[in-house]
Amino acid sequence: MSNIDYKKNIQWKEKFSNDLAEFRSKAYVDENLMPKRYVLVLTNLCNLACDFCFQHRTKQKGALNSDEWIKFLGDLPNNSRITLTGGEPLAIKNFKEIFSETVKRHECNIITNGLLLTEELIDFFLLEKNFKVLSISIDNRKNIIRKLANVKETKWDEKWSHVEKMMLYFQKRKKELNHEDCVLDSKTVVLDENSDDLFDIHKYCIDDLKCDTHSFQFLKGSPILGCDYMYKFDDIFNKSSAHKYKKWDKI
């Protein structure tokens, strides 16, 4: 990364942080202030079956369709920050329509495993200045952990090679389309299986895949946290058994 790119990277991070700090200050004073950020789990269906994923990968009763999501987006305050996720958000029918409605009045992030990305879809995203972050889930070099977790996927190497190409294409096209403030992010779930390779994963994401940012995330402490299905209210008082890392010292 050049010095100029590094300075730009720092500047947008500072602006993002300052904007959130300003909103937090306002939230303490203003009554009935709507949230600034929203995470929409468009579907809990997914084209993968990773054993460490907390989502229920079956269609839930009462799940919203694209028309209902679009109607919901119309009720949110202008200039919100919307994250579209899943499951695999690109798997929902009419995803492009949901995205288009989102970026009309809001900033938009997308979290995806990347397998359904295409050049046409990336161009479609990057034409919108309100599209801010594309996040790809990567748990080790070549995402071999996900290959092992999805043994029925016989063409994993070919499909992951496609994702790598799409990420590099994304970085090239955002410059060509003058949308360089859009961020290519990578997210890694910290597991015992990848605990010896965390620095190598970071190098893979930043150096090989040219990601602008890379973050690590731990497994949830409670199944209720960030859940995509309903619990009874009193369940919040029940003791839950968090995952215990065997290689915590290494991590």
Task: Kindly give the residue locations of the regions a language model identified.
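Conserved alpha-helical substructure of the radical SAM core
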Residues: 2-132
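Radical SAM enzyme [4Fe-4S]-AdoMet core and its adjacent flexible, acidic
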Residues: 1, 62-64, 132-251
